[in-house]
Structure formats: structure tokens, C-alpha cells
From Swiss-Prot:
InterPro entries reported for this sequence: DHBP_synth_RibB-like_a/b_dom, DHBP_synthase_RibB, GTP_cyclohydro_II, RibA, RibA-like_sf, Riboflavin_synth_RibBA
Pfam families given in the database record: DHBP_synthase, GTP_cyclohydro2
Alphabetized GO MF terms: 3,4-dihydroxy-2-butanone-4-phosphate synthase activity; GTP binding; GTP cyclohydrolase II activity; magnesium ion binding; manganese ion binding; zinc ion binding
A biological process from GO: riboflavin biosynthetic process
Positions of D-ribulose 5-phosphate binding: 28-29, 33, 141-145, 165
Top-rank taxon, per record: Bacteria
Native organism taxonomy: Bacteria, Bacillati, Actinomycetota, Actinomycetes, Mycobacteriales
UniProt-annotated binding residues for Mg(2+) 2: 29, 144
This protein's pathway: Cofactor biosynthesis; riboflavin biosynthesis; 2-hydroxy-3-oxobutyl phosphate from D-ribulose 5-phosphate: step 1/1; Cofactor biosynthesis; riboflavin biosynthesis; 5-amino-6-(D-ribitylamino)uracil from GTP: step 1/4
Keywords: GTP-binding, Hydrolase, Lyase, Magnesium, Manganese, Metal-binding, Multifunctional enzyme, Nucleotide-binding, Riboflavin biosynthesis, Zinc
Organism of origin: Nocardia farcinica (strain IFM 10152)
Function noted in UniProt: Catalyzes the conversion of D-ribulose 5-phosphate to formate and 3,4-dihydroxy-2-butanone 4-phosphate. Catalyzes the conversion of GTP to 2,5-diamino-6-ribosylamino-4(3H)-pyrimidinone 5'-phosphate (DARP), formate and pyrophosphate.
Protein name: Riboflavin biosynthesis protein RibBA
Residues annotated as binding Zn(2+): 260, 271, 273
Documented EC number(s): 4.1.99.12, 3.5.4.25
Length: 414
């Protein structure tokens, strides 16, 4: 098992102007990035980064700083697999030559970190690629972009970092993985940390959602306590329906349900969301204890209601649910489970049995101090309208849906 250094050491090194190595989840990019604070950029640091990485150096910034510096997205609708928010590339307007040397790029990096810098201080395009970090950092998105901004902020510096992926010295056609990164860090006296450890550290020291209200809600599936939350960073409101004693230390049956107006409210047969919500409430009721967490802002797998309706139009023309999103220039799945994980932790849940057919949901909740002891499958709710949709989720999105091949489009299976 790889040995990681403490977050405290990494923060101290960042504050001192050193680089650190940061590893993300093996089910995500499974890569290690060299990271240092942008305001501490020197020709020597940049040259070191260029030597051992892919050389595609980026500078993560807060959304506020991106707006202040006039840094729009590189492309209007982000299609990156992991949602990396690239902006237009830039160079410093003054103090550089061609912009590509280590010294020139260091100048541009320091300028991007300067609180007094203005949009006119930069030229576009250039040789440095700023990235727009999500508000809330690694607690909202467990990526290197957010890790860099968080580390700089935690070190008491301007929230701007410099990142690049470390290349394997054993196989230069691929990226270095965790064990090799440990050796690399030791050889160069660098701290090696994981984003999962950063999340745990921030969760221990910071709070990103607030509990607003709670009330008894009698339903057709029994009485629940509705606990309302609001996200600090985007003001989106979420509701956890709680049944029974969930703080007794035993595994809790949990369903994290994505908002679906068409399925949950209108009873649309194009998806299985409404039946899944009903089934989750019924299963928690039968269990006598558990949580159904209703996540707002997840409409259409995170693309929003209007875009979902547009995707439906494309599906009526023959696209499947994945290609319809992609044809609109949108991700196949844009949902973020970080806020949901924080809510579950606030409710006192540490160990749970997760109600889902979607393995990606488990990955989205891992790293937040939550232990998932079992994935409990949801009942299959297929019909003539959603059978193709369900098969696409199985074949192209990895959902664990059994028995679909025994059905045809003219059948309805409950």
C-alpha cells in the first residue's frame, strides 16, 4: 500500500514555494500531478515541471478571478470526460519574449495569481492555460484543478496553482501511477498526497452545506422527517427524507436520488426515475430506518430541464440518451455527488448500504469519509417507452441492469 504524506506537510511546502505531488482516485484519472502555487512560480520550478511532466501546464484559478481577468471557456460547452474547465490560453502582455520559455511562463503564472492584475495585462491566445476551479474546491469536485486552488488557499497564498501530469519514467508513453509517484516524490524530496486525504482534511475543518429546517412528512410509504439543506456555494436546496434512528452506528440504507421533474412529478415513462423514487421510499419504510436524499440540480443527469427536453427531441430522432447529450455539446453525465456526501455526513452517516444500479455513484461518494459496505440493486422498472434508454445505460454507462435482453420494445415489465 502506498505511503502518503500529511496534508500539513504539503501545505507547508506549498507556502514555502515548493512543489508537491497530488494523486487522484484510481477510478478517475488515476494520475499524479506536480503542483505548486502560481505566485511562487520561478523559472527553475517551471523547468523542473517541464522536465518530468507532459508539459501541458495549466493554472487553476477561482471562478471569480477567471471572470475578473476576462478568461472565458475555451469552448462554450465543456465535453471533457472529467469536466476540466479549460479557459482561453494566455501570456503576460509585458515582461516576456515569445511566451514559451520557463522564465516567460513563470512570469505569466505570477501575473495570473496577482490580485491587482487586469484583463488587459494578458494577451490571448498564449502559452499558459488557466483552468476554472469549482467553487467549494475538492469538496465539490475531486480533481487536480480544485486541489491546486485549495492547497494555495490553505497555505495562505492567493488561490491560484500550477499543475501538470507526471509522465512515467519507465514507460514515457504513459502517465506515472501511484507506486512510481512515491519513488519520484522521495527522489526529489517532495510530499505525496491524495485528493481523498485533502477531502478528509477539509471535511474535518470546514463546512460546505447548512441545515436549514426539518419537518415531519407523512407519505404513502410511511412517515419521514424531511431535513432541508442549502449549499453555501450555489444556494441549491436539497432534502433528505429520514426514517428511524440512523445514528446507532449500524449500516444505513441510503438512496441518493437525482431530481427528475418529468419522471418524479409528471410520471413520465421515458425514464425509470419516478418508480425508483417510489421503490426507494418503500424499501426504506420496510427496513424501518434509512435515508432517501433528494438532490436538486441533477435534472437530466445534471444538464438541466431545458437541455433534457432538447435531448428528448434528439432521442425521438434516433439518438440514444448518451449521444443526445453529446450532440448538444453536453456531458453524458454532469452530476456531482460531493454535496450529497456532505449532507449524509452531517446526518451522522458513516457506513451505508447504497441503493443504486449505477457504479459511478459509488465512486462519486467515495473519499468523503463514507464507507459503502454494500451496493443494493434497485428493482427493474422497464416499459415499452424506456427499454432502449435502460439498455443504453447498461451498455454505455455501466449500469448494472439485469434481464433487459429478455424483453422487447413491445413489452412492459414491472
Amino acid at each position: 500500500m502506498t505511503r502518503f504524506d500529511t496534508i500539513e506537510r504539503a501545505v507547508a511546502d506549498i507556502a514555502a514555494g515548493k512543489a508537491v505531488v497530488v494523486v487522484d482516485d484510481e477510478d478517475r484519472e488515476n494520475e499524479g500531478d506536480l503542483i505548486f502555487a502560481a505566485e511562487k512560480a520561478t523559472p527553475e520550478l517551471v523547468a523542473f515541471m517541464i522536465r518530468y511532466t507532459s508539459g501541458y501546464i495549466c493554472v487553476p484559478l477561482t471562478g471569480e478571478d477567471c471572470d475578473r481577468l476576462g478568461l472565458p471557456p475555451m469552448y462554450a460547452t465543456n465535453q471533457d470526460k472529467h469536466g476540466t474547465a479549460y479557459t482561453v490560453s494566455v501570456d503576460a502582455r509585458e515582461g516576456i519574449t515569445t511566451g514559451i520559455s520557463a522564465a516567460d511562463r513563470a512570469t505569466t503564472m505570477r501575473l495570473l495569481a496577482d490580485a491587482d492584475a487586469k484583463a488587459d495585462d494578458l494577451t490571448r491566445p498564449g502559452h499558459v492555460v488557466p483552468l476554472r476551479a469549482k467553487d467549494g474546491g475538492v469538496l465539490r469536485r475531486p480533481g487536480h484543478t480544485e486541489a491546486a486552488v485549495d492547497l494555495a488557499r490553505m497555505a495562505g497564498l492567493r488561490p491560484a496553482g500550477v499543475i501538470c501530469e507526471i509522465v512515467s519514467q519507465k514507460d514515457e508513453g504513459h502517465m506515472a501511477r501511484t507506486e512510481e509517484l512515491r519513488v519520484f516524490a522521495d527522489d526529489h524530496d517532495l510530499a505525496l498526497i491524495s485528493i481523498a486525504d485533502m477531502i478528509a482534511w477539509r471535511r474535518k475543518h470546514e463546512k460546505q452545506v447548512v441545515r436549514v429546517a426539518e419537518a415531519r412528512i407523512p407519505t404513502a410509504h410511511g412517515a419521514f422527517t424531511a431535513v432541508g439543506y442549502q449549499s453555501i456555494y450555489d444556494d441549491v436546496e436539497h432534502v433528505a427524507l429520514v426514517r428511524g434512528d440512523i445514528g446507532d452506528g449500524e449500516d444505513v440504507l441510503v438512496r441518493v436520488h437525482s431530481e427528475c421533474l418529468t419522471g418524479d412529478v409528471f410520471g413520465s415513462l421515458r425514464c425509470d426515475c419516478g418508480p425508483q423514487l417510489d421503490a426507494a421510499l418503500e424499501m426504506v419504510d420496510q427496513e424501518g430506518r434509512g435515508v432517501v436524499l433528494y438532490m436538486r440540480g441533477h435534472e437530466g443527469r445534471g444538464i438541466g430541464l431545458m437541455h433534457k427536453l432538447q435531448a428528448y427531441q434528439l432521442q425521438d430522432s434516433g439518438r440514444d440518451t448518451v449521444d443526445a447529450n453529446l450532440d448538444l455539446g453536453l456531458p453524458a453525465d454532469a452530476r456531482d455527488y460531493g454535496t450529497g456526501a456532505q449532507i449524509l455526513v452531517d446526518l451522522g452517516i458513516r457506513s451505508m448500504r447504497l441503493l443504486t444500479n449505477n457504479p459511478a455513484k459509488r465512486v462519486g461518494l467515495d473519499g468523503y469519509g463514507l464507507t459503502i459496505t454494500e451496493r443494493v440493486p434497485m428493482p427493474l422498472r422497464a416499459n415499452a417507452e424506456n427499454l432502449r434508454y435502460l439498455r443504453t445505460k447498461r451498455d454505455r454507462m455501466g449500469h448494472d441492469l439485469v434481464g433487459l435482453d429478455d424483453l422487447d420494445l413491445g413489452e412492459t415489465a414491472q
